[in-house]
Protein backbone atom coordinates (compact mmCIF):
# COMPACT_ATOMS: atom_id res chain seq x y z
CA UNK A 1 0.00 0.00 0.00
CA UNK A 2 1.01 3.61 -0.52
CA UNK A 3 1.07 4.33 3.23
CA UNK A 4 2.47 2.33 6.13
CA UNK A 5 0.76 4.17 8.97
CA UNK A 6 -1.88 6.79 9.68
CA UNK A 7 -1.64 9.67 12.14
CA UNK A 8 -4.98 11.08 13.29
CA UNK A 9 -5.98 14.17 15.23
CA UNK A 10 -8.59 13.76 17.98
CA UNK A 11 -10.55 16.95 18.65
CA UNK A 12 -12.85 18.02 15.80
CA UNK A 13 -11.61 15.06 13.77
CA UNK A 14 -12.80 12.13 15.87
CA UNK A 15 -14.57 13.86 18.76
CA UNK A 16 -16.93 16.84 18.53
CA UNK A 17 -15.06 19.08 20.92
CA UNK A 18 -17.16 22.21 21.30
CA UNK A 19 -20.41 20.74 22.69
CA UNK A 20 -18.47 18.87 25.36
CA UNK A 21 -16.35 21.93 26.07
CA UNK A 22 -19.45 24.09 26.48
CA UNK A 23 -21.04 21.61 28.87
CA UNK A 24 -17.89 21.27 30.97
CA UNK A 25 -17.45 25.05 31.18
CA UNK A 26 -21.13 25.53 32.09
CA UNK A 27 -20.79 23.04 34.95
CA UNK A 28 -17.54 24.66 36.09
CA UNK A 29 -18.95 28.18 36.02
CA UNK A 30 -21.94 27.04 38.03
CA UNK A 31 -19.55 25.71 40.67
CA UNK A 32 -17.70 29.05 40.65
CA UNK A 33 -20.97 30.94 41.10
CA UNK A 34 -20.83 32.63 37.69
CA UNK A 35 -23.99 32.76 35.58
CA UNK A 36 -23.60 35.55 33.00
CA UNK A 37 -24.95 34.63 29.53
CA UNK A 38 -21.66 35.84 28.06
CA UNK A 39 -19.44 33.87 30.43
CA UNK A 40 -18.55 31.11 27.95
CA UNK A 41 -17.50 33.62 25.29
CA UNK A 42 -15.41 35.50 27.85
CA UNK A 43 -13.61 32.32 28.85
CA UNK A 44 -13.27 31.15 25.26
CA UNK A 45 -11.54 34.37 24.18
CA UNK A 46 -8.86 33.75 26.81
CA UNK A 47 -8.67 30.04 25.99
CA UNK A 48 -8.30 30.73 22.26
CA UNK A 49 -5.48 33.21 22.88
CA UNK A 50 -3.63 30.59 24.93
CA UNK A 51 -4.03 27.91 22.24
CA UNK A 52 -2.73 30.35 19.62
CA UNK A 53 0.29 30.99 21.83
CA UNK A 54 0.86 27.24 22.05
CA UNK A 55 0.80 26.85 18.26
CA UNK A 56 3.34 29.70 18.00
CA UNK A 57 5.60 27.86 20.42
CA UNK A 58 5.20 30.49 23.15
CA UNK A 59 3.49 28.21 25.68
CA UNK A 60 3.53 24.49 26.40
CA UNK A 61 0.44 22.39 27.07
CA UNK A 62 1.00 22.07 30.80
CA UNK A 63 1.28 25.84 31.15
CA UNK A 64 -1.80 26.40 29.00
CA UNK A 65 -3.83 24.03 31.17
CA UNK A 66 -3.52 26.40 34.15
CA UNK A 67 -2.73 29.76 32.55
CA UNK A 68 -6.10 30.13 30.81
CA UNK A 69 -7.85 29.83 34.18
CA UNK A 70 -5.31 32.05 35.91
CA UNK A 71 -6.14 34.81 33.42
CA UNK A 72 -9.88 34.16 33.59
CA UNK A 73 -10.02 34.18 37.39
CA UNK A 74 -7.95 37.36 37.47
CA UNK A 75 -10.31 39.03 35.00
CA UNK A 76 -13.28 38.02 37.17
CA UNK A 77 -11.46 39.07 40.35
CA UNK A 78 -11.91 35.63 41.89
CA UNK A 79 -9.37 34.24 44.34
CA UNK A 80 -9.90 30.55 43.53
CA UNK A 81 -6.75 28.50 42.97
CA UNK A 82 -6.22 28.32 39.18
CA UNK A 83 -4.58 24.89 39.43
CA UNK A 84 -7.55 23.50 41.33
CA UNK A 85 -9.97 25.05 38.83
CA UNK A 86 -7.94 23.68 35.90
CA UNK A 87 -7.94 20.20 37.40
CA UNK A 88 -11.68 20.34 38.02
CA UNK A 89 -12.26 21.40 34.41
CA UNK A 90 -10.13 18.48 33.24
CA UNK A 91 -12.29 16.14 35.28
CA UNK A 92 -15.50 17.58 33.81
CA UNK A 93 -14.27 17.67 30.21
CA UNK A 94 -12.87 14.16 30.51
CA UNK A 95 -16.46 12.97 30.95
CA UNK A 96 -17.57 14.48 27.62
CA UNK A 97 -17.13 12.00 24.77
CA UNK A 98 -19.08 12.95 21.64
CA UNK A 99 -17.86 11.09 18.52
CA UNK A 100 -18.20 12.82 15.18
CA UNK A 101 -20.17 11.06 12.42
CA UNK A 102 -18.46 7.85 11.25
CA UNK A 103 -15.43 8.39 13.51
CA UNK A 104 -15.62 5.04 15.27
CA UNK A 105 -16.30 2.93 12.19
CA UNK A 106 -13.58 4.75 10.24
CA UNK A 107 -10.88 4.17 12.85
CA UNK A 108 -11.91 0.52 13.15
CA UNK A 109 -11.75 0.02 9.37
CA UNK A 110 -8.39 1.81 9.11
CA UNK A 111 -6.93 -0.25 11.94
CA UNK A 112 -7.67 -3.46 10.06
CA UNK A 113 -5.29 -2.32 7.31
CA UNK A 114 -2.78 0.05 8.94
CA UNK A 115 -1.46 1.13 12.33
CA UNK A 116 -3.42 4.18 13.56
CA UNK A 117 -1.58 6.58 15.87
CA UNK A 118 -3.50 9.42 17.52
CA UNK A 119 -1.61 12.71 17.67
CA UNK A 120 -3.03 15.43 19.90
CA UNK A 121 -2.17 18.75 21.49
CA UNK A 122 -4.73 18.04 24.20
CA UNK A 123 -4.20 17.84 27.95
CA UNK A 124 -3.00 14.38 29.02
CA UNK A 125 -5.55 13.68 31.75
CA UNK A 126 -8.44 14.89 29.56
CA UNK A 127 -7.50 12.89 26.48
CA UNK A 128 -6.80 9.70 28.44
CA UNK A 129 -10.13 9.91 30.26
CA UNK A 130 -12.04 10.53 27.05
CA UNK A 131 -10.26 7.78 25.17
CA UNK A 132 -10.89 5.34 28.03
CA UNK A 133 -14.61 5.96 27.57
CA UNK A 134 -14.53 5.44 23.79
CA UNK A 135 -14.38 2.17 21.82
CA UNK A 136 -11.78 3.85 19.61
CA UNK A 137 -9.20 2.85 22.23
CA UNK A 138 -9.50 -0.77 21.06
CA UNK A 139 -8.41 0.04 17.49
CA UNK A 140 -5.46 2.40 17.85
CA UNK A 141 -1.81 1.39 17.96
CA UNK A 142 -0.82 4.35 20.11
CA UNK A 143 -1.54 7.90 21.22
CA UNK A 144 1.02 10.71 21.34
CA UNK A 145 0.00 13.61 23.60
CA UNK A 146 1.93 16.87 23.43
CA UNK A 147 1.99 17.37 27.19
CA UNK A 148 3.74 14.01 27.62
CA UNK A 149 6.40 14.46 24.94
CA UNK A 150 7.24 18.14 25.45
CA UNK A 151 6.36 19.45 21.99
CA UNK A 152 3.14 20.30 20.18
CA UNK A 153 1.80 20.41 16.65
CA UNK A 154 2.90 22.13 14.40
CA UNK A 155 6.40 21.29 15.70
CA UNK A 156 7.70 18.56 13.35
CA UNK A 157 9.37 16.85 16.32
CA UNK A 158 6.04 15.55 17.62
CA UNK A 159 5.42 13.96 14.22
CA UNK A 160 8.83 12.29 14.35
CA UNK A 161 7.96 10.89 17.78
CA UNK A 162 4.62 9.58 16.54
CA UNK A 163 6.19 8.00 13.44
CA UNK A 164 8.67 6.07 15.59
CA UNK A 165 11.04 5.29 12.75
CA UNK A 166 8.54 5.22 9.87
CA UNK A 167 9.66 7.35 6.93
CA UNK A 168 7.51 10.53 6.86
CA UNK A 169 6.87 9.88 3.17
CA UNK A 170 5.14 6.62 4.12
CA UNK A 171 2.68 8.24 6.55
CA UNK A 172 -0.62 10.08 6.19
CA UNK A 173 -1.88 12.74 8.61
CA UNK A 174 -5.67 13.03 8.94
CA UNK A 175 -6.89 16.10 10.78
CA UNK A 176 -8.90 19.30 10.67
CA UNK A 177 -6.53 21.89 12.13
CA UNK A 178 -4.72 24.06 9.60
CA UNK A 179 -2.39 25.67 12.15
CA UNK A 180 -1.58 22.37 13.83
CA UNK A 181 -2.28 19.28 11.72
CA UNK A 182 -1.70 20.68 8.23
CA UNK A 183 1.18 23.03 9.05
CA UNK A 184 2.88 20.45 11.23
CA UNK A 185 2.59 17.72 8.61
CA UNK A 186 3.90 20.09 5.94
CA UNK A 187 6.93 20.83 8.10
CA UNK A 188 7.47 17.14 8.86
CA UNK A 189 7.17 16.00 5.24
CA UNK A 190 4.01 13.97 5.88
CA UNK A 191 1.14 13.82 3.37
CA UNK A 192 -2.08 15.46 4.58
CA UNK A 193 -5.69 14.35 4.34
CA UNK A 194 -7.45 17.50 5.49
CA UNK A 195 -10.80 16.85 7.15
CA UNK A 196 -12.76 19.95 6.18
CA UNK A 197 -16.50 19.30 6.64
CA UNK A 198 -17.37 23.00 6.64
CA UNK A 199 -15.60 23.79 3.37
CA UNK A 200 -13.17 26.34 4.79
CA UNK A 201 -10.51 27.95 2.63
CA UNK A 202 -6.98 26.65 3.09
CA UNK A 203 -4.71 29.43 4.41
CA UNK A 204 -1.97 30.69 2.11
CA UNK A 205 1.34 28.90 2.41
CA UNK A 206 -0.13 25.50 3.28
CA UNK A 207 -0.72 22.51 1.03
CA UNK A 208 -2.69 19.30 1.34
CA UNK A 209 -2.60 16.17 -0.78
CA UNK A 210 -6.25 15.32 -0.11
CA UNK A 211 -9.33 17.11 1.21
CA UNK A 212 -12.42 15.34 2.54
CA UNK A 213 -15.78 16.36 3.97
CA UNK A 214 -16.78 12.91 5.27
CA UNK A 215 -14.40 10.85 7.42
CA UNK A 216 -15.27 7.67 5.54
CA UNK A 217 -13.53 9.11 2.48
CA UNK A 218 -10.14 8.77 4.15
CA UNK A 219 -10.28 4.96 4.10
CA UNK A 220 -9.79 4.67 0.33
CA UNK A 221 -7.08 7.34 0.47
CA UNK A 222 -5.11 5.72 3.28
CA UNK A 223 -5.29 2.21 1.81
CA UNK A 224 -4.57 3.02 -1.83
CA UNK A 225 -1.92 0.97 -3.59
Task: Show which residues each predicted segment covers.
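Asp-based, Mg2+/Mn2+-dependent phosphohydrolase catalytic module
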Residues: 1-6, 80, 108, 117, ...
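N-terminal helical cap/lid subdomain that shapes the substrate entry/recognition surface
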Residues: 2-101
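Alpha-helix termini
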Residues: 22, 29, 46, 70, ...
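Charge-rich, acidic-biased intrinsically disordered regions
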Residues: 36, 119-120
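A generic structural signal for short
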Residues: 57, 95, 116, 169-170
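Catalytic-core regions built around general acid/base machinery
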Residues: 102-113
Amino acid sequence: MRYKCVLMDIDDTLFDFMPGNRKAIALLMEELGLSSPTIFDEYQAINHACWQALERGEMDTGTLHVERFRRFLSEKQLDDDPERVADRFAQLLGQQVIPLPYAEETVKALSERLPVILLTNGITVIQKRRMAASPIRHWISGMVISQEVGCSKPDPNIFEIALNGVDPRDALMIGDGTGSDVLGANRAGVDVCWYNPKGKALPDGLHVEYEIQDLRQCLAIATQQ
